[in-house]
Amino acid sequence: MPARLDARATRRYFDNAFNSPAVKILPNEYYVTNGEDVMLSTVLGSCVAACIHDPVIGVGGMNHFMLPEGDIHSPASATMRYGAFAMEVLINELLKAGAVRERLEAKVFGGGAVLSAMQLMNIGERNGQFVLNYLKTEGIPVRAQDLGDVHARRINYFPRDGRVMVRKMAPHHQKAEALIAQREAAAAQTVQAETRAAPRVERFDTPSRRDPVGA
């Protein structure tokens, strides 16, 4: 499945705290390095980020997805919003960059229930369970994970050597809360819209009242 070019993160900056060039990964984006020494950074609420790299050649990448899976019959499911698509894109782009599938290692983060609405829909929990199941199916070992809880997280990932630094953000961090609330509301609206749009399937548990054929 080809990657969406508009989903590749483009927001570059220099992080003074880490003295490193960096790329900011927003929701529904991904980034794969070509061996350059760069830090990938994102902020997570109920969303999940998978950090995957090939330790032999130092190529790695990160994605940031909001929901586990969409309706496979809907074109909307083929977007970086959904984990199933975001994971496939990330792995395919790593292989294109020279990574070897058998050497890939993963670290996964996020899936927090940072807002009450997210707790009711279990979006964070579902995202976390999805990414673990996906990686298990693909045979990619998970070397570290920090999933669940009620905190937002800032992730700083160094793909060249696989290091990840996680900072759990205070529950009342106003700037973070405002940003995450906006993203979480969008995710919740998507879930609700998909639930309303789900086709109804009629069940035929009782014998039909039609006249027998040939009557």
UniProtKB/Swiss-Prot annotation:
Reaction catalysis annotation: L-glutaminyl-[protein] + H2O = L-glutamyl-[protein] + NH4(+)
Stretches for region Disordered: 190-215
Enzyme class: hydrolase
Enzyme Commission (EC) number: 3.5.1.44
Keyword presence, Thylakoid: no
A molecular-function term among this protein's GO annotations: protein-glutamine glutaminase activity
Gene Ontology biological process terms in this record: chemotaxis
Family annotation (Gene3D superfamilies): 3.30.1330.200
Coiled-coil ranges per UniProt: none
Transferase keyword on record: no
Matches recorded under SUPFAM superfamilies: CNF1/YfiH-like putative cysteine hydrolases (SSF64438)
HAMAP family in the cross-refs: CheD
Name of the protein in question: Probable chemoreceptor glutamine deamidase CheD
Native source species: Bordetella pertussis (strain Tohama I / ATCC BAA-589 / NCTC 13251)
UniProt gene name: cheD
